[in-house]
């Protein structure tokens, strides 16, 4: 695993390059996991929202995301708040409404788990991966790439043990 080397090089300020591969924290599955955690920690993180709102697939397409953006801009809201308001005002197609509602409700549940300290940051990510369907998405597509992605996520969970809480982990990445 390259993560440990990357962490050490970053810590001592030594420049490095990964040949023939992608840096650990730049891998799609790691970015997805971090995006989930960032959005749970800070609902105003629109970049994280965009990355994960339809990952795994929730029937939330580009046109819906465009509508959310326009509504957010018009009403001076972040994307999550805009989504909530759009759901309340029935401004979302029925098929999309189901997926978006589930996503918003899940975020709320995960935040409550974190706030009420029902789960630490490591357990929280495990819960998110299971409840969001992200783990199932990777497991259901049997190929070497997805097996590697699952291994990378295990490595991320292991790396998170070095941090006392979600805030310190997010500051690090």
Predicted regions and their residues:
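Short, acidic/turn-prone active-site loops that include or flank metal/cofactor-
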Residues: 20-24
């Amino acid at each position: 695993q390259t993560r440990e080397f990357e962490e050490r090089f970053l810590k001592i300020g030594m420049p490095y390059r990964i040949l023939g591969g992608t840096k650990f924290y730049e891998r799609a599955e790691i970015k997805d996991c971090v995006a989930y955690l960032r959005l749970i920690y800070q609902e105003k993180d629109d970049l994280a929202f965009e990355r994960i709102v339809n990952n795994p697939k929730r029937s939330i397409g580009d046109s819906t995301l465009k509508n959310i953006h326009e509504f957010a801009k018009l009403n001076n809201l972040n994307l999550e708040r805009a989504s909530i308001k759009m759901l309340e005002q029935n401004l979302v197609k029925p098929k999309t409404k189901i997926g978006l509602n589930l996503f918003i409700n899940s975020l709320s549940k995960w935040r409550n788990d974190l706030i009420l300290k029902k789960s630490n940051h490591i357990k929280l990510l495990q819960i998110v991966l299971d409840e969001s369907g992200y783990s199932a998405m990777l497991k259901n597509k049997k190929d070497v790439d997805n097996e590697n992605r699952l291994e990378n996520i295990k490595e991320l969970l292991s790396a998170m043990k070095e941090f006392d809480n979600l805030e310190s982990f997010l500051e690090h990445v």
